[in-house]
Amino acid sequence: MDYSALCKEILNMDSKIRFAGVCDETGDVKYGGQREGVPNLLTQEETKKSMMQALGRWGLRNSLAPKIGKGKYAMAEYEKIKRITFPLDQEHLLLVTTEVDADHTKIINNILNKAE
């Protein structure tokens, strides 16, 4: 899968999407990034820390996969953003952030259809 193209497609999906990035198992964002003209709320270092935390949570979720199936996505809503993570493969995680008023159900469904 072309992760750069996927991130571009995601950013073009909805103007309420702030960030679409793919990180590797080290937490480094390898593809994608912030929507042009939208200010970052986190520094690059904080983004990496956030990615590492997300990777850790997905590791915990995957430990239950044999019993309940693989996770498709996880979402958290904060005061300033919504944050959605999608496991892409064993080594890559997709992080998408949106504005709080974004239609996250529509965005999640569109991303799941593209990432399959």
Sequence positions of predicted segments:
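Non-catalytic interaction/Regulatory regions outside core domains
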Residues: M1-E116
